[in-house]
Each structure stands twice: as C-alpha cells, then as structure tokens.
Amino acid sequence: MLCILYVNAVGMCLGLAALLLERALPSMSPRRWVWCVIIPISIVLPGFYRGHHAWSIADAFEQQAARPPLGDVFGTASLTLLDPGWWAQIASYDTSINRLWLTASAVLLLWGLASAWRVSRVLSLSRRLRGDAKWPATVDGVSVVVTDMMGPATVGFWRSRVLVPRWVLALPREQRQYVLRHEEEHRRAHDGRLLFVASLTIILMPWNLAMWWLIRRLCLAVEMDCDNRVVNRLGNPNAYGELLVRVAQAASRGPRLQPALLGGVGTLERRLTVLLAPTPLRHVQRFLLPAVALGLVFVVLSMPHPVLGRGSHAHVTITSGTTTTAPKPHPAWAADVVVHQR
C-alpha cells in the first residue's frame, strides 16, 4: 500500500509540473514531448528510489516518539501516521489488493484484445467487399479503409491504416480533406504506436490513478499537435473547428478508437479553445509557470520512497497468534510488529 500511495503521489506531482510547463508553451508548439518525458520518469523513479533513496517509517516513528509533542491532537496524529504497526495492519490487505490488481489487469487486457479483434474483423470485411478492386482505397491522395461506422481513426501497430466511415466520403471535398489529412498526420507521426506503448502501463499498473490521468493528457497533446499540423498545411482553423463539431455529432453512435479525429472523450472543447481562441500568457506567467513546475520536480526528486522497516529493503509484518519481538525494538510497537531484513 505504501508503494501504491508513493507511486501515485510521484505521478500526480510530475503530472502537475508537466501541465504547468505545457501551459507555458506557445499555442502552436508541440506538446506531446512533455508527457513523453514525464510518463517514463514517473515509472522509473519510484523503483530506483526504492533501492537507493528510501525512508524508514520505523526510524521516523522512534524519532517522533522521542520528541516532545506539539499538542495532543497533532502529536497523536503524527504518531499514528508513523506507527509501523498501523501500516503493517494495512499491509495485511496486500493479498486482496494483489488479487484485485491481477483481475483489473486481466480485464483491461481482454478488453484490448477484443478491440483488436473487432478492428481486424472490420479490415477483413472491408477487403472482402472491395473484391478485386484495389485495397486499401485511395481518396484525395490518402490510402484509406472504408468502413460502415468505425472511424475516422488510425489503427495498426506495424502497418497503420486510416479508417473512414462511408459518410465521410459524402462530405464536401474541403471538409473531407481535413478529415483525411488529420488521420494521415497521425499515421505519419506513428501516434498509434505511441499511444499503444503508453497504454501498456495502464495494463501493468491499473491501480496507478495518476498514470490514467497522464495517459489522458498525452492523448490530448497528441490530438492538439495533430490539429496544429493540419491547420498549418490546409489553413482556415475556423472551418476545421466547425468540422470537428460536425464529425462529433455524426460519429456519436460509432465506436471510439485512438488516435482519431475526435480524440478522447471530453477533449473536443479544450482542442477548440486552443485552436480558435488561445488565451495569451502574461509576462509574469511565462516565468512563473516554469518556475513552479521546476519546484514540483525538485519536491519529487527530494521525496524518498517510504518503507516500513529499517533500511531500504526492510519491511514490517504482523505476528499472528503469539507475540514475537526483534532485538531491542521500541516498546511502543514491539508487541505488534517484527522487523525482518531481506
């Protein structure tokens, strides 16, 4: 449980730092790199600090107990939070937590496999319907796979395909070019691979709520970068924004894939705001936002990984049945816990 709380705290602090840094960027600047840097750091740092920069709750409890309390309420609360016996009781639920962890990972994995199977069926059906005709089809210079309802989206890891539903082909040529260019930009930038690799962290750590948020921010950054590239190539951001709204209305009943023209759920308003009416930063904000972001990063780098027992690899367990004590333990929790060295 300590590890879960620490990993989420690190991810949330790093995510806030990335959010502030992203906010300080010009509206047309690439954003994905911020999250591509923060996400690996939030994964690697807790594991590295576990072995090289740990903080023992048992030692902190002894030091706190030896000091005069600041007050009855604050003294009792601080001793409770640092009591290894209390944390050891929480650790007794680790078996149940691990079972939930494996169950959630299995459900997410099955959901991902089901989505891949569904896309594979759509591709096979499209190939059969084309018959002897060229597959995939080429529309406005972009190679596409025409579907009944799925899309617009880019799918595939090794070989990306642009999926467009039939109603996209009926759009006016200018609007259709925006849709196809958006998906083609996703394909050229290998956004599908990026989001697939990033989503693996969710399968491995479904309890990491901070990672869910980081992945969502990465998806938004990928879509905003793609919007900027499309507007730079084709121009007229107002027409492009109107198309996004129209596509959202037309595709509301179809399955949602990533990366896609509509992006993640609930991100369309943010994309339109940045694209059509970006809020200019004041001079103070341009310096203050990066400074606060660096401060959060410094806090994370200074925050050790908490462990129950003494030493970076020690942990505390509850004794069952009879009381077992370690050599010269603190009398306040000697009857409840035993410190085992790995």
PLM features per residue range, with description:
Residues I39-I41, P280-P306:
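Internal/C-terminal transmembrane anchor helices
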Residues A189-E223, N238-V247:
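Post-HEXXH active-site segment of zinc metalloproteases
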Residues M1-R128, A133, A137-S143, L268, ...:
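Hydrophobic membrane-embedded segments
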Residues V34, C226, L272:
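Residue-level signature of catalytic and energy-coupling elements of molecular machines
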Residues D140-R159, L209, W213, R233-V292:
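Active-site-proximal gating segments in proteases and membrane effectors
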Residues T103-F196:
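Peri-catalytic and regulatory segments of divalent metal-dependent proteins
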Residues M28-R32, D191, H283-F287:
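Membrane-helix interface segments
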Residues W135, Q177, L220-G235:
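An active-site-proximal "capping" alpha-helix that borders the catalytic cofactor pocket
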